[in-house]
Amino acid sequence: MSDKIGLFTGSFDPMTNGHLDIIERASRLFDKLYVGIFFNPHKQGFLPLENRKRGLEKALGHLENVEVVASHDELVVDVAKRLGATFLVRGLRNAADLQYEASFDYYNHQLSSDIETIYLHSRPEHLYISSSGVRELLKFGQDIACHVPESILEEIRNEKKD
């Protein structure tokens, strides 16, 4: 029997504890789980890609079957095919997330009917955490330690020093 391989993607700008929870839970469902950082090289992100990747790798270091990869200018289904992933993992906080994700699921299925999308609901304590919310708190000098993994906090602090 072949390995079950999943792919969970996002911009992770920055990664939140909600992302971490979904990844930890998804890692138990698959033999291998790729976490794909998708970024636009023509758009200035909050954290540079290198910092995001390093922070994610540290935050996920305890998960032996998880590997962080980065991609740009590529469709998610093409990355999944390249990595041998037959499952896309998506986290849902609310009905708006489901509606947003459903349109991507439609197109992904049209492009590759072999790839299934699996939705994991956010835990109640993570329902209102978002990367954009964390960025907004940071903009106004607020503490975000309860919203992001320690390794991400370190990357943000290091980036602010520069």
UniProtKB/Swiss-Prot annotation:
Its EC number is 2.7.7.3. It holds the Pfam family CTP_transf_like. ATP binds at residues 11-12, 19, 91-93, 101, 126-132. Its main location: cytoplasm. GO terms for biological process: coenzyme A biosynthetic process. Belongs to the bacterial CoaD family. Reversibly transfers an adenylyl group from ATP to 4'-phosphopantetheine, yielding dephospho-CoA (dPCoA) and pyrophosphate. This is Phosphopantetheine adenylyltransferase. It comes from Streptococcus pneumoniae (strain P1031). The lineage of its organism: Bacteria, Bacillati, Bacillota, Bacilli, Lactobacillales. The gene is coaD.
